[in-house]
């Protein structure tokens, strides 16, 4: 008797990214819940009166069929199709499961910059991006960094000319207005395994100065020697003349050009006899400051008394 051999038809299953399933809560355990629906049907292709046997990579028996959801790491299993006869003639094939690493990304916090550079009213500032990739790929809890041998990084951003750019690094320094840069990390073996992260670059304006010089003229208060040229001034009353946003800004007053001698109580300031000068520094809520009306200008902020 010559018995016809069964046929173990070739079966395949798509490689998967770790964690890329609602059933997979751990994207770093290298195990994926594969949906094996259809494997048995493809394997037999209509054959009957046969029994199938599935063995893992260590030749441990899994079952006569695979579970509908088969949780496994990367491995190649062996499948035997055997006739239900006394001769038990059989044929074999293999099925490869591949679980690819999914990248992880971590928060990259870029400190806010004040408008600066060639112009300090154009909304641009230069940012140091030398450590962006390192921070993006490094787990802050374990200090473990994903290797660029395994993963690629790309950035989508708008350059100084308004062009949308895709590049594997950010310019350094990165001269930009406020924008969200999208970083994408991808497994080099499987481009489906990728993740994105927004990196926020924020440029905030400096104080907008209306006038850099305010003159205060006031009658002698008559205290002390008559007409001694000394009187008390509330310097804070002129803040609105310097800036429209004065209520949201911090004003500091100094008696010297180098801003080393601070006036502790500007609401009760006695001037030097007959003529005095007070120098100012104005700071926004974001910490951006001006001491002159224009960038590095000689038009210093000053009160003349």
Residue ranges of model-derived segments:
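Extracellular low-complexity Ser/Thr/Asn/Gly-rich intrinsically disordered segments
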Residues: 1-305
């Amino acid at each position: 008797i010559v018995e016809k051999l069964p046929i173990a038809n070739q079966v395949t299953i798509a490689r998967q990214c770790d964690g890329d399933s609602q059933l997979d809560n751990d994207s770093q355990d290298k195990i994926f819940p594969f949906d094996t629906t259809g494997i048995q049907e493809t394997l037999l292709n209509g054959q009957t009166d046969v029994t199938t046997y599935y063995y893992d990579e260590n030749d441990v028996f899994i079952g006569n069929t695979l579970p509908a959801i088969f949780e496994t790491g990367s491995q190649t299993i062996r499948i035997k199709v055997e006739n239900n006869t006394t001769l038990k003639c059989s044929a074999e094939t293999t099925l490869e499961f591949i679980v690819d690493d999914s990248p992880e990304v971590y928060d990259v916090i870029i400190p806010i910059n004040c408008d600066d550079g060639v112009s300090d009213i154009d909304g641009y500032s230069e940012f140091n991006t030398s450590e962006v990739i390192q921070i993006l790929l490094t787990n802050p809890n374990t200090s473990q960094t994903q290797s660029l041998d395994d993963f690629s990084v790309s950035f989508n951003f708008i350059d100084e000319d308004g062009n949308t750019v895709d590049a594997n690094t950010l310019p350094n320094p990165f001269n930009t207005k406020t924008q969200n840069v999208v970083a994408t990390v991808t497994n080099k073996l499987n481009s489906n395994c990728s993740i994105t992260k927004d990196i926020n670059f924020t440029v905030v304006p400096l104080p907008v100065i209306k006038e850099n010089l305010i003159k205060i003229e006031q009658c002698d208060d008559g205290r002390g020697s008559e007409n001694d040229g000394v009187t008390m001034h509330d310097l804070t009353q002129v803040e609105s003349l310097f800036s429209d946003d004065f209520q949201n800004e911090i004003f500091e007053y100094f008696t010297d050009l180098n801003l080393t001698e601070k006036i502790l109580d500007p609401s009760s300031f006695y001037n030097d006899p007959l003529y005095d000068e007070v120098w100012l520094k104005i700071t926004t809520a974001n910490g951006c400051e001006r001491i002159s009306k224009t960038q590095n200008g000689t038009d210093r902020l000053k009160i003349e008394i």
